[in-house]
Swiss-Prot record:
GO terms for molecular function: ATP binding; phosphoribosyl-ATP diphosphatase activity. InterPro entries: HisE, PRib-ATP_PPHydrolase-like. Its main location: cytoplasm. It catalyses: 1-(5-phospho-beta-D-ribosyl)-ATP + H2O = 1-(5-phospho-beta-D-ribosyl)-5'-AMP + diphosphate + H(+). NCBIfam families: histidine_hisI, PRK00400.1-3, PRK00400.1-5. The keyword Hydrolase applies. This is Phosphoribosyl-ATP pyrophosphatase. Pathway: Amino-acid biosynthesis; L-histidine biosynthesis; L-histidine from 5-phospho-alpha-D-ribose 1-diphosphate: step 2/9. Disulfide bonds: none annotated. GO terms for biological process: L-histidine biosynthetic process. It comes from the Bacteria. GO terms for cellular component: cytoplasm.
């Protein structure tokens, strides 16, 4: 499965009955809940990475990607925009890119 295909499925679930789909149920709870769930999954992935459990990390990484896409959908951010931003950054040094970001006073 590609991220594009998964994101398309998630977008379809935005209009589905929450009783029919875990994704629809999560999306119906709004961006805050989707962000919370993404954070939980990210922490679980970090724990597995530190433990060095490759199989568990693989599963948690899949959860992180899924929940990131759900959060993006909940916030009306298109995956194509995220990929375009990565493309924009591709030819920029990581150090230069970070120095060029807006910093609050």
């Amino acid at each position: 499965m590609t991220l594009d295909a998964l994101f398309a499925t998630i977008l379809d679930r935005k209009t589905a009955d929450p009783a029919s789909s875990w994704t629809a149920q999560l999306l119906s709870k709004g961006p805050e809940k989707c962000a919370e769930k993404f954070g939980e999954e990210a922490v679980e992935a970090i724990i597995e990475a530190v433990k060095g459990d490759r199989d568990a990390l693989t599963g948690e990484a899949a959860d992180v990607l899924y929940h990131l896409l759900v959060m993006l959908a909940a916030c009306d951010v298109d995956l194509k925009d995220v990929l375009a931003e990565l493309e924009r950054r591709q030819n920029t040094s990581g150090i230069a890119e970070k120095q060029g970001r807006f910093k609050a006073p």
